[in-house]
């Protein structure tokens, strides 16, 4: 069985590990928690949501809803966990963060083709690897990625902008 290493146990890393394992690959999932946390992470589980608990609109006629429908049809682990941990949120799919993380962690730990290892990765392995470490990548690994790619990492924060009332054009806004 071919082996693939996935670095990072967040949303992308868990989904990548799951899909590879379901396709018959032997997956080694490397996650640095609980040995090392980032400033945003607080919980020891995988697939930790650090910002909003909302996975956005659930309507099929929205881009976010269509993506979720497609992921579900493709056997997405995270969509299954999201549905099982859903909380009331109007037309959005929102989840209980702890339950969502616990469900994803349990599924990853119990998959026969996935080995979960706790490790702070500082270099990209020479073997087939998916790097899914996100915007808070450990400094040593970020430097190794830069060495391989020849450029620094660039991420945009998902924090919502703050708009002051005084800055609004009262002729154009609706209250």
Regions found by a protein language model. Give the residues of each.
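N-terminal FAD cofactor-binding segment of flavoenzymes
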Residues: 18-80
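A short alpha-helix-loop-beta-strand transition element characteristic
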Residues: 59-64, 68, 76-91, 149-157
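Helical element adjacent to the flavin cofactor pocket in flavoenzyme catalytic cores
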Residues: 97-116
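Predominantly flavin-linked oxidoreductase catalytic cores and closely associated redox partners
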Residues: 110-175
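Short beta-strand to alpha-helix junction loop
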Residues: 57-63, 86-103, 133-139
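Beta1/beta-strand and adjacent pyrophosphate-binding region of the FAD-binding site
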Residues: 1-12
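Rossmann-fold NAD(P)-dependent oxidoreductase module
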Residues: 19, 107, 144
């Amino acid at each position: 069985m071919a082996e693939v290493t996935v670095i990072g146990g967040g949303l992308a890393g868990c989904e990548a590990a799951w899909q590879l394992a379901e396709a018959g690959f032997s997956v080694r999932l490397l996650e640095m928690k609980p040995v090392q946390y980032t400033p945003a992470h607080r919980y020891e589980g995988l697939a930790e949501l650090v910002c909003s608990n909302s996975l956005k609109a659930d309507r099929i006629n929205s881009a976010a809803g269509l993506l979720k429908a497609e992921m579900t049809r493709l056997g997405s682990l995270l969509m299954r966990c999201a549905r099982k941990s859903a909380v009331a949120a109007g037309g959005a799919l929102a989840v209980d963060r702890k339950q969502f993380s616990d469900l994803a962690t349990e599924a990853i730990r119990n998959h026969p083709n996935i080995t979960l290892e706790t490790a702070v990765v500082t270099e990209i392995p020479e073997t087939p690897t998916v790097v899914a470490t996100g915007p808070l990548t450990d400094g040593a690994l970020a430097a190794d990625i830069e060495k391989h790619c020849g450029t620094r990492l660039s991420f945009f924060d998902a924090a919502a902008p703050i708009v002051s009332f005084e800055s609004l054009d009262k002729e154009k806004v609706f209250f």
